[in-house]
Amino acid sequence: RSVVILEGNRFLNQPDMRASERVREMYFSSAALVRDGGVCILIQESGHPIVTALTSWNPSMATHQDLQERLELSLPPYVRVATVSMESGEIVRLKGSLQKAIDESRLPSHTRLLGPVTIGEKSTLILTVPVADGQSLIATLHEFMRRRSAAKKALPSLRIDPYSLSH
């Protein structure tokens, strides 16, 4: 039995930081179906690390490349991430409050506030901190949620270390 994987670049051009993970799993799972005498044909840009990893049957090679890129870009698993989604006007106030907490050292100085990104009437703020400072960020966000709940205000959507950062 042989396997043909078409349009490899399309799989990797998804706006999701986990795309390469899924592609690596799909490629190696598909290639594992090849039987004696069969071939695996991959239609993919030849310079991509996944091609070298698949050719040498070494998935750790592609994983290592992925992790190196994430380290350089300060992405998970090297940082903790939280996303907060709520009404657009409120997210601006929340971002201001979080920036003030950073300035006053109530949140780690390495906390990054990304966004907000607005879709419709809701906006999402992405927060990242080094793994070592993750508990401080999470405690602050849980306190924010507790206070909103006590004040009977609408609770935002809070995701800690979400699987995906895209909507």
Residue ranges and their predicted role:
Residues R1-R18, A32-H167:
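Accessory helical-bundle/CTD segments and flexible terminal tails appended to RecA-like ATPase motors
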Residues S20-R24:
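Amphipathic alpha-helical segments in well-structured domains
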